[in-house]
Amino acid sequence: MARGKIQIKRIENQTNRQVTYSKRRNGLFKKANELTVLCDAKVSIIMISSTGKLHEFISPSITTKQLFDLYQKTVGVDLWNSHYEKMQEQLRKLKEVNRNLRKEIRQRMGESLNDLNYEQLEELMENVDNSLKLIRERKYKVIGNQIETFKKKVRNVEEIHRNLLLEFDARQEDPYGLVEQEGDYNSVLGFPNGGHRILALRLQPNHHQPNHHHHLHSGGGSDITTFALLE
């Protein structure tokens, strides 16, 4: 039974369209390769799918550029001439802009002023004044930032100094390190410069304590007995 003729029109289903594209592309590349091998032909195929993906085939004996050059030579046309002329025009405009910018820079530096008339000189002065204003504002902003940074450093140093003073005053409040406890207690008196320390014991009055201890009378109802401690 003969196959029905396929109607040539756009395939609406995207999946079917991609499948058909892949099959026919492979078939086309196969035919191009057969032409290259059987007939020693130079074949180039460039294909771009509906999704924007590029596929190409080129005979192994030639490059794409060589094939385009051969096409231009055979047909007698220059495919790159219009593109080259556009590039030349763009280059000319860029060079003109560069010359004008260099001239403006020289004029702002006080050079190349002989060709300027009165109005142009007035405009140049106004531009320079505006530039100086912006520079001056930026300078003051930088100075302000530096002052704020310096103030923060000063505040930090002052805070450290206050903390050191508080620590120093706390140490000066009890130079001997006498620590009392409620009721009967013992304490250690520490002398500076690594001197001997004395253990002080506050005891209830006791008239039968040995005489070889040192007694300190506080004037109250209890005595302080001290013992020398070795380091």
Swiss-Prot record:
**Annotated SUPFAM superfamilies:** SRF-like
One biological process term from GO is:
positive regulation of transcription by RNA polymerase II
Q: Name one Pfam family in it.
A: SRF-TF
Q: In what residue span(s) does the MADS-box domain sit?
A: 3-58
- What UniProt keywords apply to this chain's record, in alphabetical order? Activator, Developmental protein, DNA-binding, Nucleus, Transcription, Transcription regulation
Spell out the GO cellular component terms annotated for this protein, sorted alphabetically and separated by semicolons.
nucleus
Chief location of this protein?
nucleus
Q: Which domain of life is it from?
A: Eukaryota
State the compartments where it is located.
Nucleus
Question: In which tissues does this protein get expressed?
Answer: Predominantly expressed in petals and stamens, less in carpels and sepals.
Q: What does this protein do?
A: Transcription factor involved in the genetic control of flower development. Necessary for the normal development of petals. Absence of the PMADS1 protein causes transformation of petals into sepals.
Protein name, please? Floral homeotic protein PMADS 1
Q: Gene name, please?
A: PMADS1
